[in-house]
């Protein structure tokens, strides 16, 4: 599963050379859980609810202070990563990127249409997604 989202100002936690070894250990991300943005936390929870084990997040899977050549290669591979993922979680609501994914932790009060995907997960929509995306910052990004 991949996460495509707008970072927002001052990303709380990213992968850097200093924490790479710790993050590479099994369950290494648990140590940093409180430092993760709500959007990333919600995407992790959603990935688990989908029954999947892996989530690719650019801020955590690309070493942000890597040398230029390594970082350029990683950035050039992003299209392939998104294309070959099982599915992409698209967090296109850029009004407040730190709010997380609506409806993952707290139930939504808005009326919406649902399609049940599993016993614990439903897909919901209350608007025409294509019109919504045209107006978002997310739509201006190169690999979406």
Please provide the spans of the model-predicted regions.
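Fold-level signal for large, globular catalytic cores of enzyme and receptor domains
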Residues: 1-143
């Amino acid at each position: 599963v991949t996460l495509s989202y707008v970072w927002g100002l001052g990303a709380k936690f990213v992968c850097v050379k200093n924490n790479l070894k710790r993050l590479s250990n099994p369950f290494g991300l648990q140590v940093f859980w409180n430092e993760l943005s709500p959007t990333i936390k919600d995407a992790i929870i959603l990935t688990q609810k989908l029954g999947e084990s892996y989530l690719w997040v650019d801020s955590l899977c690309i070493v942000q202070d890597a040398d230029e050549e390594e970082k350029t290669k990683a950035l050039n591979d992003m299209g392939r990563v998104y294309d070959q993922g099982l599915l992409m979680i698209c967090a296109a609501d850029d009004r407040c990127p730190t709010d997380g994914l609506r409806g993952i932790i707290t139930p939504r009060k808005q009326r919406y249409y649902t399609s049940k995907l599993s016993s614990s997960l439903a897909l919901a929509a209350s608007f025409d997604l294509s019109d919504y995306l045209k107006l978002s910052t997310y739509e201006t990004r190169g690999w979406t």
